[in-house]
């Protein structure tokens, strides 16, 4: 298929160099639509803070270009690049495999030796999967394990546990990549209000030994939007979270999630609880290590397929899924110790060889967008969108984007006409969007837009004005 060439149109020039290629584009507007200008003015955002590029996918024409070659931080909209590269590099049916091995002898249901839990990079190995796999051990005849559980995380380099960009290390969105990640290293506390009794019932998942929770917290009047602050939760001790406030009356069930920093202790408590529930005696400990050469495989546990992970990554802007997808780009070339340098090399080759984007025009730092080191241009991002729209996996990819007014991060941003599959991005001082719009006349358009600087956080209306302008095209 002939490659489409993208070019930005400057205010005073037509047919300038973009992405290292020349091409004449017809019908491109180098001024902003009136409603977009009005929205910028109303929110006191300078027009120079905006970068936008819009391409008619049916005609391969740029219809709007404003600072389309300006390098900007994409925030989470870069996930569309990560997910498309993963679909094309690994395929939509790719699965991660978590391995269970042992290094001892098995006699009458007793394993005299260690059990190995070998991470295969599955970002969604959660409590239900551990329950299933422990019960698989039970079904295989295991009654007791005398040794330890050794967790092998060597598929990914240990350095991938990155520091939080905002200092909020206890928040799940800041979780670093881990080849043997379990349940996002998170505890989910559930609050179920009982209006008649004036209390909310409290419970926690996953099932763990040693965790202490109050059974209830009192209800009180308040604002639903401020339920967290009114609860006054303290999770500094992950085994004994406390709630010094009250739960807001009339707000329905809510969940509070926090990350446990000690991975081994978290997994140990989870294994202990699941082993006890399944009737397997185990009194050892969980420790990090490498699977020995003499270890024998018991079974492998397969993840969801990659297409499912892509959907969850984009619909809900899940950072840890994106990081695992990004690192997994290098798995066909490297069997262990995969790091972001390896992933960036694969990504850069794919962008150059497949998409036709010159080196360093798009820089992906960790795959998630939760980084100010990632850089893109509006023109390059619409080129990725145009390429992806022609990919054999275009359906899996585009359908993973949030739909305006319907789901994901675009649920509360409906379209007045037409429709949009749109991935958004947000960092302090940065707001972006990237996706596909189907206009009321039936044509499809690729769009990337970015706002940076003062009042960028107030820019939803500006980006929506761009979407509505595109949707009104014939």
Per-range role (PLM):
Residues 26-71, 131, 136-140:
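Beta-lactamase-like hydrolase cores
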Residues 34, 38-40, 89-359, 473:
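Conserved serine DD-peptidase/penicillin-binding transpeptidase domain
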Residues 63-66, 316, 326-474:
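Small-residue-rich helix-loop
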Residues 65-85:
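Short active-site loop at a secondary-structure junction
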């Amino acid at each position: 298929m002939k490659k489409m060439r993208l070019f930005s149109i400057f205010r005073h020039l037509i047919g300038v160099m973009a992405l290292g290629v020349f091409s004449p584009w017809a019908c491109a507007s180098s001024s902003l639509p009136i409603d977009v200008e009005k929205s910028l003015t109303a929110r006191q955002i300078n027009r120079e803070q905006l970068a936008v590029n819009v391409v008619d996918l049916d005609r391969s024409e740029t219809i709007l270009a404003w600072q389309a070659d300006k390098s900007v931080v994409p925030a989470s909209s870069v996930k569309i690049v990560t997910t498309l590269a993963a679909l094309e590099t690994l395929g939509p049916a790719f699965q991660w495999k978590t391995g269970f091995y042992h290094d001892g002898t098995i006699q009458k249901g007793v394993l005299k030796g260690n059990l190995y839990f070998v991470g295969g990079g599955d970002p969604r190995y959660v409590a239900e999967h551990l329950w299933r796999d422990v019960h698989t051990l039970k079904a295989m005849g295991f009654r007791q394990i005398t040794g330890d559980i050794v967790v092998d995380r060597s598929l990914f380099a240990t350095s991938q546990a990155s520091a939080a960009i905002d200092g909020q290390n206890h928040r799940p969105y800041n979780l670093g990549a881990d080849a043997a990640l379990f349940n996002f290293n998170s505890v989910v506390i559930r609050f179920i209000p009982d209006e008649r009794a004036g209390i909310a019932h409290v419970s926690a998942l996953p099932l763990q030994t040693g965790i202490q929770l109050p059974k209830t917290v009192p209800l009180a009047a308040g604002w639903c939007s401020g339920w967290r602050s009114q609860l006054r939760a303290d999770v500094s001790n992950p085994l004994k979270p406390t709630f010094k406030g009250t739960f807001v009356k009339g707000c329905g069930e809510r969940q509070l999630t926090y990350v446990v920093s000690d991975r081994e202790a978290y997994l140990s408590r989870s294994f202990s609880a699941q082993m006890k529930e399944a009737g397997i005696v185990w009194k050892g400990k969980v420790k990090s290590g490498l699977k020995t050469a003499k270890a024998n495989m018991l079974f492998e546990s397969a993840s969801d397929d990659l297409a499912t992970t892509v959907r969850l990554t984009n619909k809900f802007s899940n950072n840890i899924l994106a990081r695992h997808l990004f690192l997994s780009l290098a798995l066909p070339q490297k069997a262990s110790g995969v790091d972001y340098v390896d992933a960036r090399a694969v990504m850069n080759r794919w962008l150059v060889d497949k998409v036709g984007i010159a080196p360093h025009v798009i820089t992906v730092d960790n795959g998630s967008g939760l980084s100010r080191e990632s850089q893109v241009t509006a023109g390059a991002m619409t080129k990725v969108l145009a390429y992806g729209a022609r990919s054999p996996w275009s359906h899996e990819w585009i359908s993973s984007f949030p739909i305006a007014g319907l789901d994901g991060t675009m649920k509360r941003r409906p379209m007045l006409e037409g429709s949009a599959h749109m991935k958004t991005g947000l960092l302090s001082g940065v707001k972006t969007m990237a996706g596909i719009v189907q206009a009321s006349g039936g044509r499809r358009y690729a769009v990337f837009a970015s706002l940076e600087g003062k009042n960028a956080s107030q820019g939803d209306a500006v980006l929506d004005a761009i979407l509505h302008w595109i949707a009104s095209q014939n």
